[in-house]
Structures are given as structure tokens and as C-alpha cells.
Amino acid sequence: MLLCRRARARRPERSLSEGLDDLVARIRACRICRDEPEGAPLPHEPRPVVVPSQRARILIAGQAPGLRVHETGLPFNDRSGDRLREWLDVTRDEFYDPALFAIVPMGFCFPGYDARGSDLPPRRECAPAWRGQLMAAMPQVSLMLTIGQYAQAWHLGDWREASLTATVANWRAIFESGEHPRQLPLPHPSWRNTGWLKRNPWFEAELLPVLRAEIRMRMAAEE
């Protein structure tokens, strides 16, 4: 143990960035959901899709990759991503710039489909194994977008309401709570939620303008 402490003392130049790179390499090699699963193992080869960043001030905390993201290795590379970028009012190039956005879903691998053909929930093994380490490695993040019930359950704590609608409707109190990083809860941008958006017009009328202003403010700080 003493030897380890001395080794660290001789390497003060080791940066948080190097530590994050090591962490990402271990995540890319992770097979816990296949080899040590909680319940049924992942039915296909794991392919973790996660884009942490040592510079980005905005963290997108989503659910888990869909099939197309699993195939391409690019997060939100689907219709849900198109809608999310529309909400944020950013281009694809801006969205995929790691100096601007970190993208860290609750589950890093495509979880597969249920009997109805819908995506399964994020794997239960993933967040306990990796999320705390990733968050600690990104202290510069000042705005977190918690997308969907799984990210909100993990990150919002007592601020999470009984339903996603109630949680998102309470966005202003959550945003102004003084927590760090500041959080804005969002529904999943899936096109299956088009009906939800129509039933809740306040989301586009009230929340999105604040979201876009906060995004632009942080992006401008990187210019």
C-alpha cells in the first residue's frame, strides 16, 4: 500500500484526463452484463457506447443505446437523436463535439427487445459499476440533462416525482434547487412520445427556451 502511495506521489503530472482515458478503456472492455449478469445475460456481444469528456460543461444522461446506435457506435444516431438536437437547437457537429457535450447513458449497451418489440430497460449492472467513477471524473460539468425515468431515478433523488410527467413539470424547481450540476429533466425524445408532447404544450413553450439559452451560454464559453 505504501508503495502505491509513493508511486502516485512521484507522478503529480498525471491528469484527470489520463484517468478518464483509462476509465473509458475499461468501460469499452466491460462484459459484466454478459459474463456476470443480474438476471438473464445480454443476448448479444456487448458494445458499450459512451462519450465522456474532460471539457464539456453539458452532460446528456440518457437511457441506453438502441439497435442503430449499437450497430454504428454513435450515440443518438437515430430519429430520437434528431429530435433531441432539435430540442437543443444544435447541429450534428456541435452535438458530437466532446468539447461541448458529454453523452453518458444509464446503460452503455443495447439491452435488446422485449416480447412486444420495444427496447428493454437499461441493464441493471451498468450504472452501479461505472456511473460514480464517470461523474467524479467530470467535475467541470455544470448542466445535466436527465432524459427519461431511469436517469431521473438515479440522479434526481427526492426531486423525482411519482411520474415522469410530474417530474418534468417540476423542472423549474429542480433547475433552481442549487444542486450541482444543475439539472433539467426531459422526456425521452422518442417519436413514440409525440402524443406526450401534444398533451403537454408547456414543455416546448416554457422549458425548451430555457434549455436552449443554457446550452448556448455554455457553448459560447468554449468559443
Give the ranges of each region predicted by the language model.
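Short intrinsically disordered terminal tails
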Residues: 221-223
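A polyanion-binding, active-site-adjacent surface
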Residues: 5-6, 15-219
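Short stretches within intrinsically disordered, low-complexity N-terminal or propeptide regions
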Residues: 9-11
